[in-house]
Amino acid sequence: MKKLILFLFLSTSLFCFGQGKSALKDIQSIKFYGVDYSQAKVFGADESPIQFKDAFRRINELFITEAKKYNVGKQLKKEVTEISLDAVNQVNENINLAELMTTKREYSLSKEQIKAAIEALPIQKTPGVGMVFIAQFLDKSNNRGTYEVVFFNTETKEIIEEWITDGKARGFGLRNYWAGSVYSCLLYTSDAADDLI
């Protein structure tokens, strides 16, 4: 039943994304800001919140240290003019560790929460288009990570387009395991770009 709900949610999100495809089609370049974990919840994991917080920082570093694998520009077929992790590192550093873990088997962000997360990113308000992954639910019991892909105006922080996606977590060690879900979502983003942009 839960898989059916997720499928319907993904289908609805992709339909909405398709409605805004002309806006994304006209975008030639983007600034990439990494993965924002400030709104995320973790379910079913044995590791501590502080271990997750450290893993979040190291996952984002992969966009620099393993840029060939985690190549956002290649997947989107757009020029990435800048990869800046400062903003997500700052908000991730301020995660409330007492609220990171959850006992609830389902969790998702509202449109208002996503908008607030974009507003909270401490970036310079210059003309351009930014992209960020906003982590929603890291579900160890199902080996899945759910993320919101968000394109936004970096000057006004107005959201241009967004959609939800999830990816299979895999790999050895806490960082690599959840980085696997990010990589899966990055590949899915490439498929979505081919279909909808």
Label every model-predicted segment.
Residues 1-23:
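Bacterial Sec-dependent N-terminal signal peptides
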Residues 7, 33, 132:
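Residues in well-ordered beta-strands of folded domains
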Residues 18-101:
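A structural "domain/chain start" motif
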Residues 37-40, 136-141, 168-169:
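Solvent-exposed loop/turn segments at secondary-structure junctions
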Residues 93-153:
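Surface-exposed short loop/turn segments
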Residues 155-187:
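Short secondary-structure boundary motifs at beta->alpha junctions and helix caps
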Residues 188-193:
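Conserved small/polar residues in nucleotide/adenosyl-binding loops
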